[in-house]
Design a protein with these regions (language model features):
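Conserved N-terminal catalytic/coupling substructures associated with nucleotide/phosphate chemistry
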Residues: 1-157
């Protein structure tokens, strides 16, 4: 906790610090956007979104009690089921990674929430339940405007 991870953010790994009182709402507010962004890049990479690590690589963790962990998994699956076109559940996974203190003792109810997105081929762009289309970039994600979608489709030939 409060130590820095050795790996860095890049196109296949995104760090997210949970802000606000409600950890679940914070994660749910962007999880579908990042999953869609990974699905829409035409690279054969596995993407990871890690909630509980800040942009400066500091491990902050996400506080989740037992009932919240179950609710988080259920709510993320529900949110991702709204992606269009639909994706199989094997395309993503949700893991809770324990966080340790400086003495290497597990901190109770503190986790890194890791959502892993596997490559999935489609001739279409994926969109969120709000019909928003995103692309993953080195610095995060970018919401595409209608003309950008057309340009991107044309470039993919």
């Amino acid at each position: 906790m409060n130590s820095k991870v050795e790996f860095e953010e890049n196109i296949d790994m995104e760090f997210k610090e949970v802000k606000g009182i409600n950890s679940i709402d914070s994660i749910l507010s962007t999880v579908d956007q990042y999953v869609v962004a990974y699905l829409n890049i035409k690279r054969n990479i596995i993407g990871k979104i890690l909630w509980g690590i800040s942009d400066d690589r500091t491990v902050t963790g996400v506080r989740l009690e037992y009932s919240e962990r179950d609710k988080l998994r259920r709510d993320v699956v529900n949110k991702l089921s709204q992606i269009s076109p639909p994706i199989p559940s094997q395309v993503y996974s949700i893991s809770l990674v324990e966080v340790y203190d400086e003495n290497m003792k597990v901190i109770e109810d503190k986790y890194i929430v890791e959502v892993t997105v596997h490559p999935y081929s489609s001739e279409y762009f994926f969109s969120t339940g709000k019909d928003e289309v995103y692309l993953k970039t080195d610095g995060g994600k970018r919401k595409l405007k209608t003309h950008e979608i057309q340009i991107e489709l044309k470039s993919r030939g």
